[in-house]
Swiss-Prot record:
Homology family: Belongs to the PyrI family.
Biological process per Gene Ontology, one example term: pyrimidine nucleotide biosynthetic process
CC terms in the record's Gene Ontology section: aspartate carbamoyltransferase complex
Record's keyword annotation contains Cell wall biogenesis/degradation: no
Keyword flag Lipid metabolism: no
Lineage of the species this protein comes from: Archaea, Thermoproteota, Thermoprotei, Desulfurococcales, Desulfurococcaceae
Highest taxon of source: Archaea
InterPro entries found in the cross-reference section: Asp_carbamoyltransf_reg_N (IPR020545), Asp_carbamoylTrfase_reg (IPR002801), Asp_carbamoyltrfase_reg_C (IPR020542), Asp_carbatrfase_reg_C_sf (IPR036792), Asp_carbatrfase_reg_N_sf (IPR036793)
Name under which the protein is recorded: Aspartate carbamoyltransferase regulatory chain
Length: 159
């Protein structure tokens, strides 16, 4: 295609997240705690609604200098299962992971039930959710049985 090329330059080190469903890039940045003011520590490129042969449209994130944590893969898998998470070092991809919904999530998703033991300040119970459906995505709290589905899940990600 004429005029096709890089929208954003390559990064020396950090992460590139590709094949994000359109409209979810900022949800990912928020969940990672990378929106301002904390986000000013890294150079972040956000591409919204780019053309994609696989998805039709997609979002892309490039975060230069960011060192991913294991929790990040779990959080991002909840937001955008199927997206590709690339770790970059010296301009090369050194690790590539296809994000997926975690089978179990401990301390990442908050139970929305106000009477759940994990919501009580006096209790030390950490939230624990198990995947009960891939499509649509759904998680169930192991303590109270509350089930959450779809985009509602994104609102329950703990900071």
């Amino acid at each position: 295609m004429e005029g096709e090329g890089l929208l954003v330059r390559k990064i020396r080190s950090g992460v590139v997240i590709d094949h994000i469903p359109p409209g979810r890039a900022f949800t990912m940045l928020k969940a990672l705690g990378l929106l301002p003011p904390r986000g000013y520590r890294w150079r972040i490129a956000v591409v919204i609604n780019a053309e994609s042969s696989k998805l039709g449209r997609k979002d892309i994130l490039k975060i230069e200098g960011y060192k991913p944590r294991q929790r990040d893969l779990e959080v991002l898998g909840i937001i955008a299962p199927g997206a590709t998470f690339n770790v970059i070092e010296d301009y090369k991809v050194v690790e590539k992971v296809k994000l997926k919904l975690p089978e179990e999530s401990q301390g990442v998703l908050r139970c929305p039930n106000p009477t759940c033991i994990t919501r009580k300040e006096r209790e030390k119970a950490v939230s624990k959710m198990v995947l009960v459906s891939q499509d649509p995505p759904a998680y169930r709290c192991v303590y109270c049985g509350t089930t959450v589905m779809g985009d509602e899940i994104h609102d329950l990600i703990s900071p």
